[in-house]
């Protein structure tokens, strides 16, 4: 859904009234608010007035826009404060002005593109803050002569897939399964999907970028330098600046691909198959990706069991897939009836959970419809989970029920790229990455049940500790998890940051902190899990 510009009325004449509703009683603070709002028009392009893009709490559209892209109700409804303003940037100069004026008047800036941060750090803070909403900066400019595209930060993965398909049926791009992810944040943490084994991460196919630094300058790859370009690919861009756009290299895909889902319960041998999957999936040819997804179900009456789904994507036709599976993973028993052949863009709908035959127009729906209360955690596995460990996993799933697990194989292209190539350090040596999630609804307790469900997510995470990576126990930054370490909203202690930094970035953390010290030495861009400047020696 594209938000009409008509819902953003000119508010310049109402600025002072809006300020009064959020301004502390202290007169100096009042001056800061007033000065901040007066600063914005002076620092932006007057031909596209930024006043049209500013929302304050007294504006009728403020609450709607604030919650529209706040996708985790757990973080949104438990927030102790709301932004003093939302700047719905429609021009790069609006984003530049937000940086310059927030820095000048001591407001924290939170940057939101799709609003899928699992801990809500793109739209919440415990200190006075402004949201810079990139949603309207969503242009996608594809050049088929060079097989490249410039994609603005506010575009979604679904829009990107749709625009590629408009130009070609033999091109695609390796990024997320969810089609409402904002490109700005998704790529900055790495960006992965079902093409990961063939083409690596999204960032492995990024060739340039436009970044606004803490001084409000727009930098490209050449002007930012290779160190910064290295850091923003996998290091979490919001520690270094604001991504305006990425230049990507499109990848080749066949005209027809094959997808499948095979499901087996514990009674049908799912444990043996899951054990075998760990040995096979990371070593399959690059063209084949098979996700393992276990879930608890009722097997008649009150009998609980676990059903394991093997969800596959093959860059080729069904006959070739069947020949490959009969050699590499015959135990799964894949048949021709299990296979669906379709175009690559249609396969993005399959992975996103749309029904077979859905129009690709659904890729243009930009906002997640179903918002839930959720808590997510992640793991990397470097060794096969023994059957005893799988049985532990099954038991916890049956005990908790609301938990979901996704296990995504590595290998292939991920095995070939050095940990040092980009800031993303989880490469060779990993068999698979795991997402653990728990979701609940308002009827199941809503925000008041947060403590209970978060504790349940930790129970599963702790149960799998003996089998996951260790020293450090690695985690994926795009599955943000404050449990693994955090700072206060307005502080970034280096020693505290090392705790989560080592888990997200392994040995790349120190280099990231060094880059941070060069591009943002005063630490303007920060959040509870940002990268601090490396202390001087």
Predicted regions and their residues:
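Soluble FAD-dependent oxygen oxidases
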Residues: 2-537
């Amino acid at each position: 859904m594209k938000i009409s510009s008509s819902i953003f009325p000119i508010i310049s004449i109402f600025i002072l009234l809006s300020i009064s509703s959020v301004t502390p009683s202290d007169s100096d603070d009042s001056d800061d608010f007033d000065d901040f709002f007066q600063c914005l028009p002076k620092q932006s392009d007057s031909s596209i007035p930024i006043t049209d893009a500013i929302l304050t709490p007294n504006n009728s559209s403020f609450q709607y826009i604030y919650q529209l892209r706040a996708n985790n109700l757990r973080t949104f409804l438990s927030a102790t404060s709301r932004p003093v303003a939302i700047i719905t940037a429609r021009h790069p100069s609006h984003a530049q002005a937000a940086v310059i004026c927030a820095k000048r008047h001591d407001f924290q800036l939170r940057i939101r593109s799709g609003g899928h941060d699992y801990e809500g750090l793109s739209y919440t803070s415990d200190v006075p803050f402004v949201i810079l909403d990139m949603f309207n900066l969503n242009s996608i400019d594809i050049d088929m002569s060079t097989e490249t595209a410039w994609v603005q930060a506010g575009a979604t993965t679904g829009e990107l897939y749709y625009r590629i398909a408009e130009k070609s049926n033999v091109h695609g791009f390796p990024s997320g399964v969810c089609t409402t992810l904002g490109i700005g944040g998704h790529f900055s943490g790495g960006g992965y999907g079902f093409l990961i084994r063939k083409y690596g991460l999204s960032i492995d196919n990024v060739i340039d970028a436009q970044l606004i630094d803490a001084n409000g300058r727009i930098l490209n790859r050449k002007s930012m330098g290779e160190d910064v370009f290295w850091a923003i690919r996998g290091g979490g861009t919001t520690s270094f600046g604001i991504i305006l756009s990425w230049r990507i290299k499109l990848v080749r895909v066949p005209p027809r691909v094959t997808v499948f889902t095979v499901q087996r319960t514990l009674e049908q041998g799912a444990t043996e198959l899951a054990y075998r999957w760990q040995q096979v999936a990371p070593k399959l040819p690059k063209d084949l990706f098979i996700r393992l997804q276990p879930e608890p179900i009722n097997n008649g009456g009150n009998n609980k069991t676990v059903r394991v789904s093997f969800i596959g994507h093959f860059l080729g036709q069904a006959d070739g897939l069947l020949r490959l599976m009969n050699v590499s993973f015959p135990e799964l028993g894949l048949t021709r009836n299990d296979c669906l052949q379709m175009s690559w863009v249609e396969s993005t709908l399959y992975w996103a959970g749309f029904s077979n035959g859905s129009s690709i127009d659904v890729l243009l729906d930009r906002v997640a419809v179903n918002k839930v209360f959720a808590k997510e955690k992640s793991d990397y596995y470097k060794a096969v989970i023994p059957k005893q460990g799988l049985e532990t996993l099954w038991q916890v799933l049956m005990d908790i029920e609301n938990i979901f697990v996704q296990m995504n194989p590595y290998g292939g292209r991920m095995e070939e790229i050095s940990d040092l190539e980009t800031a993303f350090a989880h490469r060779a040596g990993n068999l698979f990455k795991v997402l653990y999630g728990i979701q609940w609804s308002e009827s199941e307790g809503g925000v008041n049940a947060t403590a209970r469900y978060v504790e349940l997510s930790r129970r599963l995470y702790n149960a799998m500790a003996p089998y996951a990576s260790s020293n450090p126990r690695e985690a994926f930054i795009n599955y943000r998890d404050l449990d693994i370490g955090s700072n206060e909203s307005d502080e970034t202690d280096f020693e505290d940051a090392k705790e989560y930094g080592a888990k997200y970035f392994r040995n790349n953390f120190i280099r990231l902190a060094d880059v941070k010290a060069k591009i943002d030495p005063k630490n303007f861009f920060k959040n509870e899990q940002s990268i601090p400047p490396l202390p001087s020696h």
